[in-house]
């Protein structure tokens, strides 16, 4: 029997500045390697001291991406899942907080046998265990993105661990990819390489020499500049990759492929590979850049000043557009602007559909309710997600049933009509008697759909699984009243105790649907989520005159 090939490790580092697109570069390379027939998994090492981003301010961190096993992770894990078209788990995101918590717990249990616990070897060994834990019999390549920028104090233990991994598994089994910035200086009309040179020098100071450099720039990089980077940073000229700003993130795999990055990596690591078949990806890009139709979808949210707070929602909308051969123009609507009927009418004027995403806290809630009342009364296709479902129920209770003051106990503990209430197992958290972090209803849970409902039609089955992140639920004491007034409870947990989906009948509204889950987390560009596909289809039909929907099915993964 042939010996199993050693799992290869590819580390992605960043230099000069943050937000260069390390995650997208790593995701796109993973996409290319998978298209070449390799089995790829990915991991993000985050240098912050938080255990996870679950309690971090969305304005600072962006969205929290929840995996099937309930881990609250960095938004880059969402990029990994979408580009690899695979489900990852909590081991895909490692933070300094997790590492130190684990090491300190082991020290308290006496596992270090009286050793003086230090960054080297104890912290670095813990990091290495997490990295090597991603390898396995069914994995050819582990791509590990090291967060932060080379030179940051917080990143040093992760870089040292990566250096040691190379020493332990062999240099032929490890590849270091450095993503750096080539800034353009207007007065001189030049792309400058010096920041990248200093960045690579800083990397060398910790014992790492990059095998390839991805040069980010806002304009094409001339051959003489690439040659200079090659010479001064001591990498092969073919390993200097030009990554100019792309119109769409889904262009990046083709950009990197055209530069030869994937071919260089597989040759350098001695991996077997096949050629990439671009047929289906090209059709996806055609729908991205030259769609047959366009729709405008309003996103009514609390954190619209930072679009990354809703990254997966936006990508799910775009994927729903791809499925319908439609471009999606997102109108960012701060929920506060919709508190009055006039404000909602102005903010939502001429939109073809609305999505009300998740969130926490009372700020902006009355605006979400105002937006939902406007879309319900005016027949505008609407999709509610998590908090969006709760707001749909509150708005319906107030304005259809007539329960004045109906609310969620999250926003008004003294409400006379608590149509949304704290889940039983969350009472101690809300009361402050348990930790807040990592204690919500997290991860993938099943739901049973009601036959002949819109969600049943969209999913095409009666049992589904979706990812969740919430503490509050529809109060069962009001379910009978809600249903009697016309709100359809179209999906529940298998035991019937938790409301998972609500909708209005199509005889009343063309598309008014909400879920307690976060379906955006399971959407892929090549496998759009049915709820978002349905929203975009309804938005196209809502336009006047209706646009013919003669599109082919969305392309599947290569």
Swiss-Prot record:
Q: Where is the active site?
A: 386 (nucleophile), 518, 520
Query: Which pathway does the UniProt entry assign to this protein?
Result: Pyrimidine metabolism; CTP biosynthesis via de novo pathway; CTP from UDP: step 2/2
Q: Which UniProt keywords apply?
A: ATP-binding, Glutamine amidotransferase, Ligase, Magnesium, Metal-binding, Nucleotide-binding, Pyrimidine biosynthesis
Q: Which CDD domains match?
A: CTPS_N (cd03113), GATase1_CTP_Synthase (cd01746)
Which sites bind ATP?
Answer: 19-24, 76
Query: Which residues constitute the signal peptide according to the record?
Result: none
User: What's one GO MF term for it?
Assistant: metal ion binding
Residues bound to CTP: 18, 152-154, 192-197, 228
Q: Which residues bind Mg(2+)?
A: 76, 145
Q: What is its EC number?
A: 6.3.4.2
Q: Which residues form the Glutamine amidotransferase type-1 domain?
A: 296-545
| Region feature (Amidoligase domain) | 1-271
Assembly notes: Homotetramer.
Q: What family is this?
A: Belongs to the CTP synthase family.
* Comment field (misc): CTPSs have evolved a hybrid strategy for distinguishing between UTP and CTP. The overlapping regions of the product feedback inhibitory and substrate sites recognize a common feature in both compounds, the triphosphate moiety. To differentiate isosteric substrate and product pyrimidine rings, an additional pocket far from the expected kinase/ligase catalytic site, specifically recognizes the cytosine and ribose portions of the product inhibitor.
Protein name per the record? CTP synthase
Q: Which organism is it from?
A: Acidothermus cellulolyticus (strain ATCC 43068 / DSM 8971 / 11B)
């Amino acid at each position: 029997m042939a010996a199993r090939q050693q799992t290869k490790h590819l580390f992605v580092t960043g230099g000069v500045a943050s937000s260069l697109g390390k995650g997208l570069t790593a995701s796109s390379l993973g996409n290319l390697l998978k298209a070449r027939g390799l089995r790829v998994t990915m991991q993000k090492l985050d240098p912050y001291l938080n255990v996870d981003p679950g309690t971090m301010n969305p304005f600072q961190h962006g969205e929290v991406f929840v995996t099937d096993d309930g881990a609250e992770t960095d938004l880059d894990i969402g990029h990994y899942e979408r580009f690899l078209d695979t489900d990852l788990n909590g081991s895909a995101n490692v933070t300094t907080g997790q590492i130190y918590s684990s090491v300190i717990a082991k020290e308290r249990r006496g596992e270090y046998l009286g050793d003086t616990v230090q960054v080297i070897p104890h912290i670095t060994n813990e990091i290495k265990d997490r990295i090597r834990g991603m390898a396995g019999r069914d994995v050819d390549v582990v791509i590990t993105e090291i967060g932060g920028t080379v030179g940051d104090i917080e990143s040093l233990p992760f870089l040292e661990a990566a250096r040691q991994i190379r020493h332990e598994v062999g240099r032929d089994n490890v590849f270091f990819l450095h993503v750096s910035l080539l800034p353009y200086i207007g007065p001189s009309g030049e792309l400058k390489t010096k920041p990248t040179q200093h960045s690579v020098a800083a990397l060398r100071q910790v014992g790492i020499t990059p095998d390839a450099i991805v040069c980010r720039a806002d304009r094409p990089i001339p051959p003489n500049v690439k040659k200079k980077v090659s010479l001064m940073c001591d990498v092969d000229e073919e390993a200097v990759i030009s990554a100019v700003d792309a119109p769409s993130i889904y262009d990046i795999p083709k950009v990197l492929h055209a530069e030869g990055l994937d071919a260089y990596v597989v040759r350098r690591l001695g991996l077997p590979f096949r050629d990439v078949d671009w047929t289906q990806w090209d059709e996806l890009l055609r729908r991205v850049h030259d769609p047959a139709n366009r729709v405008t979808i309003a996103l009514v949210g609390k954190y619209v000043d930072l679009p990354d707070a809703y990254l997966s929602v936006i990508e799910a909308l775009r994927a729903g557009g791809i499925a319908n051969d439609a471009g999606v123009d997102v109108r960012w609507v701060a929920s506060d602007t919709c508190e009055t009927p006039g404000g909602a009418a102005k903010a939502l004027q001429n939109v073809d559909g609305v999505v009300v995403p998740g969130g926490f806290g009372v700020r902006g809630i009355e605006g979400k309710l105002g937006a939902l009342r406007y879309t319900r009364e005016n027949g505008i296709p609407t999709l509610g997600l998590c908090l969006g479902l709760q707001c749909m129920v509150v708005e319906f209770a107030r304005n259809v049933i007539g329960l004045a003051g109906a609310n969620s106990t999250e926003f008004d503990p003294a409400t006379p009509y608590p149509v949304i209430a704290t889940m039983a197992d969350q009472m101690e958290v809300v009361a402050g008697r348990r930790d807040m972090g990592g204690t919500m209803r997290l991860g993938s849970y099943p739901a049973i759909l009601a036959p002949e409902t819109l969600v049943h039609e969209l999913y095409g089955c009666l049992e589904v699984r979706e990812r969740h992140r919430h503490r509050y639920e529809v109060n069962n004491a009001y379910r009978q009243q809600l249903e009697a007034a016309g709100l359809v409870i179209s999906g529940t947990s298998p035991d019937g105790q938790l409301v998972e989906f609500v909708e209005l009948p199509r005889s009343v509204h063309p598309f008014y649907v909400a879920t307690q889950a976060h379906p955006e987390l399971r959407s892929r560009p090549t496998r759009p989520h049915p709820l978002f596909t349905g929203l975009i289809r309804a938005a196209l039909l809502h336009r006047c005159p209706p646009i013919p929907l003669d599109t082919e099915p969305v392309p599947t993964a290569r």
